[in-house]
A protein has these predicted regions:
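Hydrophobic alpha-helical segments, chiefly the membrane-spanning helices
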Residues: 38-62, 67-90, 97
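Proteins with a high burden of low-complexity, intrinsically disordered sequence enriched in S/T/G/P/A and R
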Residues: 2-16, 56-60, 65, 74-77, ...
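Acidic, serine/proline-rich low-complexity intrinsically disordered regions
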Residues: 3, 144-378
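Generic local-structure boundary detector
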Residues: 28-34, 63, 67-69, 82, ...
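Short, structured coil/loop segments at alpha-helix boundaries
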Residues: 10-13, 42, 82-84, 216, ...
Length: 378
């Protein structure tokens, strides 16, 4: 039936695999291109560096830049590389709980209130700019970069700068008026560490937030957007988004608190309305919370949307299901599962082909018998 025999299975030997890796390295090192320094990646590609650090769960900008250069800009590959590096690190300390009210704020905005204590601080953002290609970047040099930095610093009014200080939470205004949903007795007090304990459903809120902080940015944005469009979530109002640095404290062997450094984070608190119930006729407001490494405001806001959606419970929509959200936004796992389809599966597929060929032959034999029987009766 098959005139051409099936091809022999391909043997991916070590020699062939090593040659393929050399070709991949050659593609990155094409002649005529200038190598990109790791310091340049850290300084000029901070958005993608922050994304890789957050999804890998490791605050190390230099290592994230190395992983990104090694992966040729593939964020999924870079996250897997950085997570692999993270597994060999020794956990020497556990930091104290960080109070983000003590954040050194670089950016702080609220869409819920026009005026907030301390004022709105736009900080570094492109939210209000047009998304047009900047052709000047094509001719950018070290000299033009230095000139632009010098001009920016010269234009600063040092006298107008306010003293450095921290800001209280905008949502504390609602809490002071008793407008936020009161805390319930079943809300956890112990933090579930997803790097040490497996997740079981229904998962505690701390585990859900940790999973979202390490989730793939595009995946949680898609699910959060589905919730905004009515598929199991809501359309919140941004109580506050803040970007800044927070101090990291640990306790040394003598029991003394030590500041070992700081990390840059983005924090978002979304305000949503609660549906009125007969048992509780007061339409309180509820908060959805998100916090992630670096400046990744989209991710933090989407975390808050999904935090609120998963607290609603039920299985009516993907954004509500804890299991669906946590499993399907885990970028490293989903990337690995999809790309594993490219690995050799010759034995299984050959078995399927043999079964199919046998079934086709049996069908042809039955058809031939029926045709012969019909011919004998005619």
């Amino acid at each position: 039936m098959f005139s051409t025999p099936p091809p022999a299975p391909v043997q991916f030997t070590r020699k062939v695999i090593a040659a393929a890796e050399r070709v991949a390295r050659f593609e990155r090192l094409r002649r005529g291109t200038t190598p990109i320094a790791v310091a340049s990646l850290r300084g000029q590609f901070r958005a993608v560096i922050d994304q890789v650090m957050g999804e890998a769960g490791l605050y190390a900008s230099e290592h994230a830049a190395l992983a990104l250069a090694q992966a040729e800009g593939d964020t999924h590959e870079a996250v897997v590389i950085l997570r692999a590096f993270r597994t060999i690190l020794v956990r020497r300390y556990t930091s104290a709980v960080i109070d983000t009210t003590g954040m050194f704020v670089e950016r702080r905005i609220s869409s819920a209130f026009r005026e907030i204590p301390g004022g709105q601080i736009l900080g570094p953002t492109r939210d209000y700019s047009q998304r047009l290609l900047d052709a000047a970047l094509a001719t950018e040099t070290a000299a033009t970069v230095d000139a632009a930095a010098t001009a920016f610093e010269a234009g600063l009014d040092r006298k107008a700068l306010k003293p450095l200080r921290t800001f209280g939470k905008v949502t504390s205004l609602l809490r002071a008026e008793g407008l936020l949903r009161p805390a319930t007795e079943d809300e956890e007090t112990r933090v579930h560490d997803i790097t040490r304990e497996p997740i079981r459903f229904p998962a505690p809120r701390s585990a859900r937030l940790q999973s979202l902080a390490r989730a793939e940015t595009g995946a949680i944005m898609a699910l959060a957007y589905s919730g905004m469009r009515g598929q199991g979530g809501d359309h919140p109002t941004i109580g506050e988004v803040r970007v800044g640095r927070v101090a990291v404290r640990v306790t040394d062997a003598r029991g003394r608190a030590r500041v070992i450094g700081s990390v840059r984070v983005t924090e978002a608190e979304n305000i949503s309305k609660i549906k009125v119930k007969k048992k509780d006729p007061v339409p309180y407001m509820s908060l959805g919370y998100g916090l992630c490494f670096g400046q990744n405001e989209t991710k933090a806001i989407c975390m808050g949307i999904l935090d609120r959606s998963m607290r609603l419970g039920g299985d009516g929509a993907p954004a509500i299901s804890q299991e669906f959200v946590i499993y399907h936004t885990e970028g490293a796992d989903s990337w690995g599962s999809v790309n594993s389809l490219k690995l050799p599966a010759h034995v299984e597929f050959a078995s399927d082909l043999n079964l199919l060929r046998a079934a086709v032959e049996r069908k042809l034999a039955r058809d031939a018998e029926k045709a012969a029987a019909a011919a004998s009766h005619s």
